[in-house]
């Protein structure tokens, strides 16, 4: 229940974005209908329900309509005092007295130190519900302290933000031909509360020392402030620009921008000026959006900025203090490194507030309130190769990434290029997209260049395509070598659909590696190599390859017999990373040799691993903060995408052979870790680029999107494409589209 676009107000846009986030994350599991709030009867309603907020009887009519709709399970009221008629909007009580569905609220304003009448009214509102959302911790504290509301019914959810691909301002400015300019910006529906005058007056002082500054004032004037076609506030601002002689330094963008264009302007901003003058403004969407686009900020002190804007992200100044705005802005303009670091800190800080993560918080609360056992499943994101391609040069896939910017100085590894070859090959097999082939050639060529005369491989190559001799000498390269064999085998297994030159190169490298493969000792290396050997043998049966598989996996059996006990059915006295490859190796050895011992150990060891990763408390990734040793308690946190991806790959192999439906359920549970079913309830991928985040820590996500994490996420996502299910048929009842309008 809310205003909704095309109505031009911040709450309308907030509601639209919240719903889009929910639909993006949960898809066909749920539908959202709108009860649109209007000030007068609407001739042609576009939403499922419409409420004339000035008609007291209409509140009862709408409540009865909703009561009679069996599909409606919950009513979520977006609450602002000005949205509803009556004293403090008390017409809403007519609806609450009549509605029989569960109700929750979002309070967009929480007024501290209320008078007795306001306090009584707010407590009365919440007597109709045991749930309310607020957007700041301070709002939660005010409700508890000033209104005597119990903490258990309050859910703190940050104002949502759009996920963007990180860029430096200089990169983003190219789109707007603003290279070389120092860009300041402010956006939103303009009005007196925005206090743009302060920004302009500060600008007149700033340009004395920084004449190359351009101040973007983005957005239309609030429609309620345009009377008889006269835009008094904008006229006032333009007159001030004239008075201060700032024509060369100010650009009014007097239009509603679509979301992506707005975000591009924010990414091109060197410093965002948040000039609001309302000391009681609980939350600001414009402030949140600016931080999420990596803008360093100079911001007025309001409750939201005081709570969120730490000194490593920007500077807080007194409301309306022109000198403080100018001084802080000049300080930041004089230090490029400081601005860049502040922008990155702001970007990292706001990722938890993405609309996808906000949707998860809402849905977790909704499921507590809905009065039946409705199953709500995650929807699978679109398969995206944007970041994979961004990480790839003509030499190969770059190892690391600084947020989403590839770090060329980190060089290249056989590990990453082998994984990339497997993943992009899977994508080609699924889609037949010939744009994948040049990338497969790049990764294959890298593997080919890494191969030594004896058939083994080096792993580390620098940005100039030179071998890292010391690193390759110091590090045990068995795992990376074995991954190379896995990748080569995966290509050869696709020989019927790939160009001959790709298959020929892969076959040449593969056969050359076989004498080395016989000598592998480490368990995981045996597993990776066995996977490649099995894939080769599945399309080109070869007694020598079969013999190597048997020889290697006999070593694994020996390991198992040494270490396995009644309560620890495993190949070693510890669980580390990529554990699923070991039972998977046993499975492939069984499929090639038909020896019962391999099947027995494959199933026993997989069951043991699943018992450690899938518990009554949910899915648990083996922590890299300290491996899980036999007889000890497992460590917490320090979770990496590679382990999640590997268990999905393992379960996929076992499901394909044994068709045990439990394996499929485990796969879905594990993949949900990427989608937000983890201890932070946050997504582990970038939905815009397909980048995979590098790790899930105790309190935060590592937002770097390196090769390993990105390819592991992609591999898991490609596997899950085979298991996509429409759980139920749902009609999308969101009928309107509008450009982004924010007035908060």
Predicted segment positions?
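Nucleotide-activated donor-binding/catalytic signature segment of Leloir-type glycosyltransferases, i.e.
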Residues: 229-256
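Conserved acidic donor-binding segment of nucleotide-sugar-dependent glycosyltransferases
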Residues: 311, 315-322, 331-336
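Short acidic/histidine- and often glycine-rich active-site loop of Leloir-type glycosyltransferases
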Residues: 283, 302-316
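Conserved donor-binding/catalytic core segment of Leloir-type glycosyltransferases
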Residues: 178-194, 200-203, 216-218
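Short hydrophobic beta-strand element within catalytic cores of glycosyltransferases
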Residues: 296-299
